[in-house]
């Protein structure tokens, strides 16, 4: 083997190793045990506090890793349609292991991002976040009732506090 071909082989192996490590670093968290009812009740508190601080009325849902409802709360004067939307956002974040804003951004980008529309259960609107404990997804939170950015702000407050 010549020096040139040896260097190419080493460069190829290094490129593959870097690409693989990048892909592994971006892999979503694995699923863990389901969030408890007590922890689900605690998880919604930062979202509700963020909404109250800003005079927003929201509905908040927490689901387990399989997308089953664990806890739900709706503030007074929240639009009625937000009840199911909050559950759908939470379920989407749990089942697809990512914030729902990722789908919103993919859809907004157009092109291949339009494939989001064919994913059953994917909600392309900000406001859903996985809940992570010890590096594992134990559930997800969904918020609806304000603008999608405001819903996301509330849900993120809960997801960040939950870690």
Regions found by a protein language model. Give the residues of each.
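Bacterial N-terminal signal peptides that target proteins for export
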Residues: 1-13
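N-terminal signal peptide c-region/cleavage motif recognized by signal peptidases
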Residues: 20-22
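Flexible, solvent-exposed loop/hinge segments and secondary-structure transition points
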Residues: 24-163
């Amino acid at each position: 083997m010549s020096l040139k071909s040896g260097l190419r082989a080493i460069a190829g192996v290094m490129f593959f190793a870097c690409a693989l490590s990048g892909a592994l670093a971006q892999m979503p968290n694995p699923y863990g045990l389901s969030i408890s009812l007590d922890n689900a009740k605690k998880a919604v508190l930062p979202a509700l506090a963020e909404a109250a601080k800003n005079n927003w009325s929201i509905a908040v849902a927490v689901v387990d890793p399989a997308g089953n409802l664990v806890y739900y709360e709706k503030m007074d004067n929240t639009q009625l349609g937000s009840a199911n939307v909050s559950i759908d956002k939470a379920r989407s974040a749990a089942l697809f292991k990512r914030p729902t804003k990722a789908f919103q951004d993919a859809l907004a980008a157009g092109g291949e991002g339009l494939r989001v529309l064919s994913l059953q259960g994917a909600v392309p609107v900000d406001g859903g976040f996985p809940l992570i404990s010890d590096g594992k997804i134990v559930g997800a939170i969904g918020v609806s009732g304000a603008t999608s950015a405001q819903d996301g702000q509330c849900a993120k407050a809960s997801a960040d506090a939950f870690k």
